[in-house]
Amino acid sequence: WRDAPSFFNYITRCQSFLQMGRPDNDFLIYLPVYDMWNEQPGRLLLFTIHHMDKLAPKFIDAIHRINNSGYDGDYISDNFIRSTRFKDGQLVTSGGTGYKALVVPAAHLMPSDVLTHLYELAKQGATIVFLENYPTDVPGYGQVEQKRQSYQRTLRQLPAVSFSETTVTPIGKGKIITGTDYARTLASCNIS
């Protein structure tokens, strides 16, 4: 195809401009993939971004509620949470992008080391938001009792709150915010 070199040069130029930009979303939003897999019937565990409304209706509802509250966010997985740090007043991902807070929307399953890392980030100065509930258990069956014990130790360190009210609890240099009213709870992050 004779136009291919020109077309590829155009794509290269466009990509260069796109890569010069910086994301400016307000929040990191925890992607509860273990909840999604747990709720899928059968043994074929697929993850396709184009059918999220069918695979994860609760998560998509939470995303709509966050967006309708006037905020936007980027999804983050367990693996990327593990490498996220708190630096210069922001949560910074391994890619170097900074965010003002991390939101966990109504997740039920979360690895114990991820919950512990979120608590440590709050102690360092980060804002961590739990909407509707704290996660209640760890995923999987490998070393499940050991993981549950570790999980329960961290869970006992989190503020004992009624999620029916928006609560801001100082944790070290940061804070943990809890609640079920998305607009009010997210507004407590003081992000404009």
Q: For each of these PLM feature ranges, what is it?
A:
Residues 1-192:
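Carbohydrate-binding surfaces of carbohydrate-active enzymes
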